[in-house]
Amino acid sequence: MQNQQPSTLKEIRVHGTQDFPCAFYQTGTRIKGNMVKHHWHEEVELLYFSGGEFCLEVNMERFNISEECFYFINPGELHSISVEKNGGCVENAVVFHMDMLSSAYALDQIQTNLIQPVQNGSIQFPRCLRKNEPAFEPVRKSYEEIRNVFGGDSFRENYYDGEAVTDDITRQLFIKSTLLRILAVLSANNLFEVTEKNHDHRIETIKTTLTYIQENYKEKIYIRDPVSYTHSDAADDSLRV
């Protein structure tokens, strides 16, 4: 599923197509261990866990998952997924760039108060949606519609790993309108969050620190080394996260 750029942990791939940057993914395994390595990308990722036991890490914060739920990965966030027990585990994801929902010709409140703030990082998607939350069912319904438009029959086998994209304009219209519906549900439930002031700096420090460790894993590493590498005392804190 991934191609990584070792020096930055940024994923090198086109999600969807250049004209329609949106894709559907399914990843499954029966074996305990790492399933998706640490990486980041500029797109939003909506993860759906239908069951199984996972550990999702986002910016070095761990989330243990053992029941049906959604998780959102905001643009630029470092994340990975591991499976906690042997057995059948499957996760699905819709990955899309916010640019596909943006319009330079319609600077209405949707653009100025929602789309652009997500693009510039001043607000962000909620981290998680659980079954007991009012927004869960409408988001799940919309998510399943997107999955089916992408060709849901291709993903019926429990442990099939794959990617679906589309060049069909009618399918693209359905997908785009359904993504906007998900945003509307989140907005109606006041689930978009104001980004913490030090959020971007902390993420970049974590990325730089992990990059240093990755590039120097064969050598003995002292805390002062990545701190010096990042030119920031914040790296010291990141190593203890």
Where are these regions (language model features)?
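Short, Lys/Arg-enriched, Trp-marked, Pro/Gly-tolerant hinge/linker segments that flank
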Residues: 125-137, 150-225
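Short hydrophobic/aromatic patch on the recognition helix
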Residues: 68, 237-238
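Conserved short histidine dyad/triad with adjacent acidic residue
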Residues: 24-40
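A cytosolic small-molecule/anion-sensing beta-strand core signal
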Residues: 50, 66, 75
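Short, conserved beta-strand element in jelly-roll/cupin
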Residues: 40-55
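Conserved small/polar residues in nucleotide/adenosyl-binding loops
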Residues: 229-236
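Short acidic-glycine-tyrosine-enriched beta hairpin
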Residues: 60-72
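A hydrophobic/aromatic-rich effector-binding and dimerization subdomain
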Residues: 2-27, 78, 82-159
